[in-house]
Amino acid sequence: MAKILVLYYSMYGHIETMAHAVAEGANKVDGAEVVIKRVPETMQPEIFAKAGGKTQNAPVATPQELPDYDAIIFGTPTRFGNMSGQMRTFLDQTGGLWASGALYGKLASVFSSTGTGGGQEQTITSTWTTLAHHGMVIVPIGYAAQELFDVSQVRGGTPYGATTIAGGDGSRQPSQEELSIARYQGEYVAGLAVKLNG
């Protein structure tokens, strides 16, 4: 059994929705055990509430549990072309795992969201840098998801990983195409993890 962790941070719910789609795709793969968790919130509760943050029910992960998984699919909103501060804070606590090589050879993939589309690819590739330092095997999705060829509408989605465009005010929710790409990413990564674990 290959253990897959979908680990995310979501303030307004877009990445949370994408995380569930990623997990749905991963759950299609026989031999995959899928867990969804989130990184801890670092904002003060009153500031989080004033900013319109959405309460989420996923359990909170700890850095120490990451070696328990064969693949980790990270989800983070874009903050100025980078991962969110909450995800950065979480990953900055993995120094002990890095020192011991605990994540070496594990699969890693990334999905993201942006307000207007700016920085979605940069967020994914800049997150890869941290994962590469851990010796993780980075898994992009390429162009196998046919939705990536559709240019008839505004949508997220890149060969690097699934994305969604939330709109400047956060009112746009992930489209069916974006969710389909996210499901593909989950299924693809889980399939690789099962093969490598087999």
From Swiss-Prot:
Chain residues that bind substrate: W98
Keyword flag Methyltransferase: no
Gene Ontology CC terms: membrane
Catalytic reaction equation(s): a quinone + NADH + H(+) = a quinol + NAD(+); a quinone + NADPH + H(+) = a quinol + NADP(+)
Keywords, alphabetical: Flavoprotein, FMN, NAD, NADP, Nucleotide-binding, Oxidoreductase
Source organism, top-level taxon: Bacteria
Cofactor(s) the record lists: FMN
EC number of this enzyme: 1.6.5.2
Positions with a binding annotation for FMN: 10-15, 78-80, 113-118, 133
Family (UniProt): Belongs to the WrbA family.
Record-given protein name: NAD(P)H dehydrogenase (quinone)
Organism: Citrobacter koseri (strain ATCC BAA-895 / CDC 4225-83 / SGSC4696)
Taxonomic classification: Bacteria, Pseudomonadati, Pseudomonadota, Gammaproteobacteria, Enterobacterales
